[in-house]
């Protein structure tokens, strides 16, 4: 194995090197090759599920509590509320029922942006073309996200025999236990195939 050694943890930075626990990468100023292993797994297994990946965070969202990084080296959104997670996975939001029109509008906007960028590309020098290529790559990724949302927007969410009645966020056992329960349910219902649960400290 290679790339698993992280010398930064030997330099007395306390909890700060935790940002690289899933990526083996500590320098927050450089983003190249900083994808975390959970997101690499999501890239391979997450194309057939409602959620490509899910990242749960227990407790306060501190600078060094971010451990999931996308292929651009950017932090992946973390959810810290069990109720929000439950609703995301299993509850139908009334707003979701009207999202087909919104998604169609999003696709139209992306098509227009893509056409405009491609028309500009021919008039640019090599450096600017490289930047446009990066921009178009980002546009394509957003387009894939929109298509994914459109595909799942008219498909029913799974039903589970689980509720959060009596849940007390102030109880460490309740809080962490609920996050772990929801992680298991997300996998059991095949809502995702990549779940990361971050439990910093209390």
Annotate each language-model stretch with its function.
Residues 1-202:
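Ligand-binding pockets and gating/stacking loops
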């Amino acid at each position: 194995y290679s790339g698993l050694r992280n010398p930064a943890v030997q330099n007395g930075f306390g909890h700060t090197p935790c940002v690289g626990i899933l990526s083996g990468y500590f320098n927050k100023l450089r983003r190249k090759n900083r994808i975390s292993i959970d997101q690499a797994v999501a890239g391979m297994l997450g194309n057939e599920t409602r959620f490509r990946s899910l990242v749960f965070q227990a407790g306060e969202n501190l600078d060094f509590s971010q451990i999931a990084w996308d292929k651009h080296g950017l932090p992946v959104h973390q959810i810290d509320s069990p109720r929000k997670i439950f609703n995301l996975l299993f509850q139908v939001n009334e707003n979701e029922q009207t999202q087909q029109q919104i998604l169609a509008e999003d696709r139209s906007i992306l098509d227009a942006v893509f056409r405009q960028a491609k028309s500009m590309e021919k008039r640019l020098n090599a450096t600017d073309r490289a930047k446009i290529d990066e921009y178009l790559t980002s546009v394509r990724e957003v387009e894939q996200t929109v298509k994914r949302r459109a595909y799942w927007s008219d498909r029913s969410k799974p039903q589970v025999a689980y509720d959060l009645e009596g849940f007390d966020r102030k109880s460490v056992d309740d809080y962490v236990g609920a996050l772990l329960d929801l992680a298991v349910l997300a996998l059991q219902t095949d809502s995702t195939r990549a779940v990361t649960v971050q439990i910093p400290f209390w």
